[in-house]
């Protein structure tokens, strides 16, 4: 059996995952990256996206929100705002959030003081699209 790296995903609610895995692929703010056993130490910010990990032939996917990642001593730890396993994502809710966000973005002639609201709508749309992508296994 190949060497493994310990993966831990922590949210404000507590530890979501703590297991040995073969490989981790993460959505870093500077681009996606992969980590295997014995990886060099690394710190990275994490953006909203799909975090995947493999154990043997089994591939698992989580939707993670923003946070941080540390690789050290054959362990990779993610501290993220939220994490949802593929099977836990409510696709109906995600689709409704996508539609709401698209409607907010589609409004024209927003006053300048609503620019913040528009940015929030874009972030909500991005989260909904990632949830749907993870739920559909893409």
From Swiss-Prot:
Subcellular location: Cell inner membrane
Main location: membrane
Keyword line: ATP synthesis, Cell inner membrane, Cell membrane, CF(1), Hydrogen ion transport, Ion transport, Membrane, Transport
Claim: Flavoprotein is one of the keywords in the record: no
GO cellular component: plasma membrane; proton-transporting ATP synthase complex
Gene3D superfamilies, alphabetized: ATP synthase delta/epsilon subunit, C-terminal domain, F0F1 ATP synthase delta/epsilon subunit, N-terminal
Entry membrane topology: Peripheral membrane protein
Oligomer status and interactors: F-type ATPases have 2 components, CF(1) - the catalytic core - and CF(0) - the membrane proton channel. CF(1) has five subunits: alpha(3), beta(3), gamma(1), delta(1), epsilon(1). CF(0) has three main subunits: a, b and c.
Function: Produces ATP from ADP in the presence of a proton gradient across the membrane.
Family: Belongs to the ATPase epsilon chain family.
Protein name: ATP synthase epsilon chain
């Amino acid at each position: 059996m190949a060497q493994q790296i310990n993966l831990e995903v922590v949210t404000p609610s507590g530890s979501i995952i703590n297991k040995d895995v073969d490989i981790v692929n993460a959505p870093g703010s500077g681009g996606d990256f992969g980590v295997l056993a014995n990886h060099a130490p690394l710190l990275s910010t994490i953006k909203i996206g799909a975090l995947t990990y493999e154990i043997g032939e089994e591939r698992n996917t989580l939707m993670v929100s923003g946070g941080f990642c540390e690789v050290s001593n054959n362990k990779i730890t993610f501290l993220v705002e939220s994490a949802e396993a593929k099977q836990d994502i409510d696709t109906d809710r995600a689709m409704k959030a996508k539609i709401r966000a698209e409607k907010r973005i589609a409004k024209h002639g927003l006053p300048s003081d609503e620019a913040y609201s528009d940015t929030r709508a874009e972030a909500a749309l991005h989260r909904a699209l990632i949830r749907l992508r993870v739920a559909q296994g893409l």
